[in-house]
Amino acid sequence: MNLCSSGATASTTSLSSTGQAERSGGVPGGGAEGGGGDGGSGNSGGGGKANDGSAEAPTLCFAGGSGTAGAITGSAELTNANSPANGAGGASGFTGSGQQPTGSNGHSHLHNENNANMPPETRPKMVTVKHPESNKPKPTTKKSKPIQADQDVIKALQRCRDEGIKRLDLSKSSITVIPSTVKECVHLTELYLYSNKIGQLPPEIGCLVSLRNLALNENSLTSLPESLQNCSQLKVLDLRHNKLAEIPPVIYRLRSLTTLYLRFNRITAVADDLRQLVNLTMLSLRENKIRELGSAIGALVNLTTLDVSHNHLEHLPEDIGNCVNLSALDLQHNELLDIPDSIGNLKSLVRLGMRYNRLNSVPATLKNCKSMDEFNVEGNGITQLPDGMLASLSGLTTITLSRNQFASYPTGGPAQFTNVYSINLEHNRIDKIPYGIFSRAKGLTKLNMKENMLTALPLDIGTWVNMVELNLATNALQKLPDDIMNLQNLEILILSNNMLKKIPNTIGNLRRLRILDLEENRIEVLPHEIGLLHELQRLILQTNQITMLPRSIGHLGNLTHLSVSENNLQFLPEEIGSLESLENLYINQNPGLEKLPFELALCQNLKYLNIDKCPLSTIPPEIQAGGPSLVLQWLKMHSPYRQM
């Protein structure tokens, strides 16, 4: 029996441009690390493609769907940066936002304003399918079965057949079943079924022999029909967020595939048949339960992006070194014990994600990957890097070695940081920053040395003149050098959890400082020069031994957050009333603070006031319990300066 026999006549309308799938490719797992990064979950599976000039190719967009009619994008994995924000222009649609173009009646349609001036016979075909529920609010109770939606699918398929539609979008439509009549839409090149409730596809899906893009993400699929192998032109297949326990065997026979998304399923293994997909350029197996990646991966020599993050891999095959075109390799959040030496063959590698594994070392052959711009091994057990490795990677701009077991800076001297602008060594066991280590790092703007064992800062700290963010929290620092005054580009300075007894007067030179965190030190007095920090927005002095605030604090006109809790304050200066921007004030747990200045009532923007465990004898308890607005009102009412 021929499943594909029908009386339908294929449309003679042709798609004027090919290669849609190739142009719609992207780097998975964007987020902080891009291709090798820790991207978001990317549950949205929207459509959208670059305008291919095929204005004559009719499109059917189901009104209950997203209204997107283009190549598969969505999530952080495929995004068309050139897509128009308003969705006008027909197929040159969207980036997975789930928005749909609407007409005055709220129905989904595809429209190009330029078509209005075209003769009727030359205008592109447009089909609008009105969903009976499209203008009604979403029900608060879940329907047992969206019968009406399934009926509308039948109508949509009929129009697809009759109108010669090439792109069909049935996404986000509560569909449970795809009718067998889908076989009549043999001219389809793009089919979007994402975000439905489909449990299985009919065998007739294999009749769509012209299909190039197929989006099935965010459904409940556990398998695929064998007939899908007839779709020999299929380029892009999206199966993210389904219930696949294995890679369906039929996929290995789709040798035309260039992009395959299998993210967030229940896959435990990858068959050796993977080697047949030699045209793949992008493969995402992220967020599955895979324990082993076999040697077949080495046959995919055209791969440029491979994402196997968030699995249970302990080893990689040496064959990974055959994938010489890889530019993005994401291995983060696995259980990797080692990285094969063959990784050094990947000379096109730009992003390599190795965060949060069980690595104790990395291979010296990584020196060959000179195109890398980011090196990130956060959350492993590495004690040292191969000699001079970072210096060999001269293109590096970001280095993250946090949460490892480093006892000292990597060997390689100042040369290893020449082009670096961000260094993160948080949560290691480093007790010293070598003198002159940043002498060539003229672009260094961010340094994070939080949670180490530093007892002092290098004498050349004054040469770090381009530093913008400096985090030295949770160390054992006893003194801040006077040369800190030279860091005049500094905006964020974190010194919490140290052993500082005083702050140098030269702190007043840091005129761009926005955040100053001195929590949990042994500070008794703040310098008067603190009032020169006019850009300061957050001043955190919690848990010190401060007995009074300098009157110059009233000059901090941009201050929004002031925390002086858990100190030995005896009073607040009247000048605190000049802090017009102040929103949050923490003065709790100051056992010697018995009264508040009436001038505090001048802080009109104050939203939060914590005075817990302060023996305020002048303000009635019921007023204190009423919150900051009531306290401020009381202060104003009892002020000797009523006119204020």
Curated annotation (Swiss-Prot):
Instruction: List compositional bias (Gly residues) regions by residue number.
Output: 26-50, 87-96
Q: Which PROSITE patterns match?
A: LRR
- Key words, A-Z: Leucine-rich repeat, Repeat
Pfam families from the UniProt entry: LRR_1, LRR_14, LRR_8
Compositionally biased spans, kind Polar residues: 99-117
Extent of Low complexity compositional bias: 1-19
Q: Where would I find the LRR repeats?
A: 164-185, 187-208, 210-231, 233-254, 256-277, 279-300, 302-323, 325-346, 348-370, 371-392, 395-416, 419-440, 443-464, 466-487, 489-510, 512-533, 535-556, 558-579, 581-603, 605-626
| Ranges for region Disordered | 1-60, 82-150
This chain's function reads: Acts as a Ras effector and participates in MAPK pathway activation. Probably acts as a regulatory subunit of protein phosphatase that specifically dephosphorylates Raf kinase and stimulate Raf activity at specialized signaling complexes upon Ras activation.
As for family, the record states:
Belongs to the SHOC2 family.
Query: What name does the UniProt record give this protein?
Result: Leucine-rich repeat protein soc-2 homolog
The gene for this chain is Sur-8
